[in-house]
Design a protein with these regions (language model features):
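Compact, glycine-rich, soluble single-domain proteins
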Residues: 1-122
Length: 122
């Protein structure tokens, strides 16, 4: 069973981005991600977790992903360092700055988050 976490945008007042995001810290759960799924619900999300900040280890692919994804890179301090609307079947997306966490979810997330925002995982 994969653990879940609540993802909050720290603002005044705090905004919940995803009430239950899959916490993917094992190789197999990170590899699987949203591949081979045909649909993405608005409240679906996952967090790919690395051991430390980096650019290469937090790069993602969109092979066998059939829908657009909001991708939000967050560093170890909880700061959003990059965002992108990832398109199906693209080979690679990498953050502009080192990150430890990669949040993937419905494209609507991009309207709620910007670089420099603070994120908290509960």
């Amino acid at each position: 069973m994969t653990a879940t976490r609540k993802i909050n945008l720290i603002s005044d007042p705090a905004t919940t981005l995803l009430a239950q995001a899959r916490w993917c810290d094992a190789f197999t759960s990170k590899l699987r991600g949203f591949t081979f799924r045909r649909h993405l619900a608005e409240n679906d999300g996952l967090v790919l977790v690395e051991k430390e900040d980096g650019r290469i280890n937090t790069a993602i692919h969109m092979l066998f992903v059939f829908f657009d994804l909001a991708v939000i890179w967050v560093n170890d301090a909880g700061q959003v360092v990059d965002t992108v609307l990832a398109k199906p079947w693209r080979l690679s997306y990498a953050p502009q700055a080192p990150a430890r966490y990669v949040i993937e979810g419905h494209p609507r997330l991009l309207s709620q988050v910007k670089v420099g925002d603070q994120i908290r995982f509960e």
